[in-house]
Amino acid sequence: MTKDQIKKPTFKENVDSFVTQTSKIIRFPKDVIEYIKCGHSVMQVTVGVKIKNTIRNFIGWRAVHSEHRLPSKGGIRFSSNVNQDDTEALAALMTYKCAVVNVPYGGSKGSLKINPNNYSEKELRAITKNYATKLAKKGFLNPALNVPAPDIGTSEKEMVWIMDAYRNLFPEDINYTACVTGKPV
């Protein structure tokens, strides 16, 4: 078999492999480990935004690995190098990080396939708000269930835009400011 024919494991497969190896050391039952490795849900969205008289489409994801403890917590990443597998792997890692230090959150992660440096602030605001609206309408953005934070390619600015999108959808939610962390103080 040549080097090119060898299939490299995906990021998610690597994460699952580490969990399996660890389970043997700590002697967790195999069925429990298989359940732990399964993600709860993942949503793919297409974000369409009019930019310079053309509709541009961006693919995004929000993965929820665990809802064992709520809310699920994890960043939103804007990068041209994201995909569903990586998003799910990062959500799983968030679950494990929270569990190891006994922080009462499940794990989640979001991503949008975009190079944010290629867009003006006005364009990026429209893209971010559209993405946030799609997440919120499906329950993937909610102060009690799923709370994003900044990650690669996002900052407190995007978190404010996400909070604004959530507040516009759910003006009756008095806890709307808790729908994201990483906002300016």
Enumerate the language-model features and the residues they cover.
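Amphipathic, alpha-helical segments enriched in basic
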Residues: 3, 7, 11, 24, ...
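Generic recognition of stable, solvent-exposed alpha-helical segments in well-folded globular domains
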Residues: 14-17, 82, 86, 126, ...
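Glycine/serine-rich phosphate-binding loop and adjoining beta1-alpha1 elements at the start
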Residues: 79, 99-185
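Hydrophobic, Leu/Ile/Phe/Ala-enriched alpha-helical segments that form helix-helix packing faces
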Residues: 19-26, 91-94, 131, 135-139, ...
